[in-house]
């Protein structure tokens, strides 16, 4: 394979979601690099109607007339030959969702680079943004690494940090990190062969886990601070919720913590007050003031409106269970 000797690189891009799509768009519109192909996940059934839907990255690639590859397995000879025949210099991976085998990475003279939304080695794994919010981190950032055959362990090429605000959700924090990572990716690709000096990651790694819908269930035995962090971390997905009588599921979109010094007279899970400020619930430590909620099939509304929706349970003194 002949390496492209110009500043303009021949790239294979791998990604799936909106975060990935925005990076692909930046590479196409703000650089002279040529995208020879896009690897993305197979179309999947989404929504209540289970309609087969293409990834946002695929939709953009199709619009830009870039060849799209959607392998169900990445270790087949067919997929290998498809990528090999593109004769690309490098593969760039941004929120693809699958592990790229070393066999595929070896195709590219410049190897592969990955954009990760944390300051590695902190929060390796699939949910670094949510993990930073759940942990109450005050600082996070993005890291661009040289890919190897392990997950998020490659040498660091570039990193940039940003402050986490107390009001940040996963979506607002991701938007801030997207700006940093797009800028960083463009910078890294300039004179790629001679412009960076990789740094080996330290051994002080922490790990994030795959998120499931059940993770977003509000457990009143936790502290108000823990619950408020969860509400921000799981926005916009899977959205925190609690259940009434183990049936009615109420989504919680926003909340804040009230420091309360006379908590002993309330039970954990008890609704203390519902007013224009929200619905206040006793937790294991302090009060969680829920401000915006969503009933099944309804629009997001202020928690005070629950009193106007004929919900007999929605009165002070009601004890919400953890089941």
Curated annotation (Swiss-Prot):
EC number per UniProt: 2.1.2.9
Residues given in the record as (6S)-5,6,7,8-tetrahydrofolate binding sites: 118-121
One Pfam assignment: Formyl_trans_N
Keywords assigned by UniProt, alphabetized: Protein biosynthesis, Transferase
Known function: Attaches a formyl group to the free amino group of methionyl-tRNA(fMet). The formyl group appears to play a dual role in the initiator identity of N-formylmethionyl-tRNA by promoting its recognition by IF2 and preventing the misappropriation of this tRNA by the elongation apparatus.
Similarity field: Belongs to the Fmt family.
Designated name of the protein: Methionyl-tRNA formyltransferase
């Amino acid at each position: 394979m002949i390496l492209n000797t110009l500043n303009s690189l021949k790239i294979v891009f791998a990604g799936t979601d909106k975060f990935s799509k925005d990076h692909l768009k930046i590479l196409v519109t703000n650089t002279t690099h040529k995208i020879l192909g896009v690897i993305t996940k197979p179309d999947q059934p989404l929504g209540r109607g289970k309609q087969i839907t293409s990834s946002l990255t695929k939709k953009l690639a199709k619009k830009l007339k870039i060849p799209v590859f959607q392998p169900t397995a990445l270790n087949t000879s067919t997929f290998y030959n498809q990528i090999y025949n593109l004769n690309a210099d490098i593969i760039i991976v941004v929120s693809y969702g699958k592990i790229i085998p070393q066999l595929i990475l070896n195709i590219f003279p410049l190897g592969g680079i990955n954009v990760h939304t944390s300051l590695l080695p902190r929060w390796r794994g699939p949910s670094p943004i949510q993990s930073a919010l759940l942990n109450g981190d005050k600082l996070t950032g993005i890291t661009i690494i040289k890919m190897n055959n392990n997950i998020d362990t490659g040498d660091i090429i570039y990193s940039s940090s940003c402050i986490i605000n107390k009001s940040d959700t996963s979506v607002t924090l991701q938007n801030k990190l997207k700006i940093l990572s797009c800028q960083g990716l463009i910078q890294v690709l300039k004179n790629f062969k001679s412009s960076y000096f990789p740094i080996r990651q330290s051994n002080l790694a922490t790990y994030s886990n795959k998120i499931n819908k059940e993770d977003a269930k509000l457990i009143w035995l936790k502290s108000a601070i823990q619950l408020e962090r969860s509400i921000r971390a799981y926005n916009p997905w899977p959205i925190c919720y609690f259940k009434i009588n183990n049936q009615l599921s109420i989504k919680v979109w926003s909340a804040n913590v009230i420091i309360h010094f006379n908590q002993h007279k309330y039970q954990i899970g008890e609704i203390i007050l519902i007013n224009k400020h929200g619905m206040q619930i006793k937790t294991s430590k302090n009060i969680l003031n829920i401000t915006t909620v969503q009933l099944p099939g309804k629009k997001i509304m202020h928690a005070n409106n629950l009193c106007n929706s004929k919900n007999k349970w929605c009165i002070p003194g009601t004890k919400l269970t953890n089941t």
